[in-house]
Amino acid sequence: MEFSVMLNLLIEGTVMTAEIFFVTLVLSLPLGMLVCFGRMSKNIIVRSFFKFYISVMRGTPLMLQLMVFYFGPFYLFGLQITDTWKQLAWILGFSLNYAAYFAEIYRGGIESMPQVQYEAAKILGYSKSQTFMRIILPQVIKRVMPSITNEAITLVKDTSLAFTLSIMELFNQAKALAARETNMIPYAIAALIYYVFCLLVAFVMEQAEKKMSYYR
């Protein structure tokens, strides 16, 4: 196989990897905040539910979760697995998994805020929602940015788990090409692409963190 053809196939895989990454990030970041609110709820039923959800998502392998979402409808209800469901399965699997991790990151940031800030905001006449949105949340985001960056970099590498659903992302393309060509060149190129992707994510997140430094 010509090198240009191999490279084009790996680029196609990279596009799929990027799609998984960005869709997961866009969905799991806000969902994680909602899960965080549920985890910190004063209602014991709500709090227990989200605590259990987080425990399951963090305590079982992401690969297993993807397979449950993908094959679950077939084994439980006898439903036919379609390409549309395959797309929905990885979206649900990745988003729900990472939402649990982001929820705990947010919770740690919120609980680290001094109680005196809430009291000062109350004295100034701020409502609870105003206090959170205008005073607490900006500081929390700044504090948790390093942890979010670490999770984002982990997500870049975790996208390779989509191969379990036969999705032709970067790793799966490299695996197929390496088997066809019986050499390690596709793996080496894929490793380089993953590394550059991680560097770009780290750079973007670092710039975002610097822009928020005025919250200190």
Where are these regions (language model features)?
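Transmembrane alpha-helices and adjacent helix-loop boundaries
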Residues: M1-R216
